[in-house]
């Protein structure tokens, strides 16, 4: 951990931002292209097609795939450039113990209450009316998408839904922010607490 990286942390940070931008663009294009080709709809009708109940399974897998491209690939690419073993650099290992499992459960449970409190605080912060209207519109669209994706008719749907719309995207997001961005920021600032704080804010 104390060894000097092959690629400077400042360069890794720039690469990560660049790859993230490219990943977000490619994931959006990939989602639109796959939807248009597989569901036989024009590009302009892709959002409506993804919201239809009969296309919910496709939407789930497409969401997981695009999240993988947008979040996981950039972090993996930077780690691959910076070291020989990308997965080890990202923090993946085969060792796990019961303390880690319990810690994850406790943190996740606590985060539920914290997110609710932060949401309430966010509501009382004064914001421009046009910004609030735009933010609420985006939130409503997101909630509608989540409701569509979360439609589950049986236990198989439940398990598949949890894997595709919850577990997989959460893992890919954590790889980007914790294993990718946080690792680089800690190395860049040479301060673990500061690097973790900055990545948490972002």
Which residues does each PLM region occupy?
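Juxtamembrane helix-loop-helix connectors linking adjacent transmembrane helices
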Residues: 46-53, 88-168
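Aromatic-enriched alpha-helical transmembrane segments of multi-pass intramembrane proteins
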Residues: 63-73, 146-157, 192-194
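Hydrophobic alpha-helical transmembrane segments
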Residues: 13-18, 61, 101-106, 159, ...
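Hydrophobic side chains within alpha-helical segments
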Residues: 66, 70, 119-120, 176-177, ...
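N-terminal, membrane-interfacial amphipathic/helix-forming hydrophobic leader that caps
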Residues: 1-101, 109-110, 116
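Transmembrane helix-loop junction
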Residues: 79-80, 120, 183, 187
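Transmembrane helix-loop-helix hairpins at the membrane interface
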Residues: 114, 151-202
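Juxtamembrane transmembrane-helix termini
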Residues: 38, 42, 123-126, 186
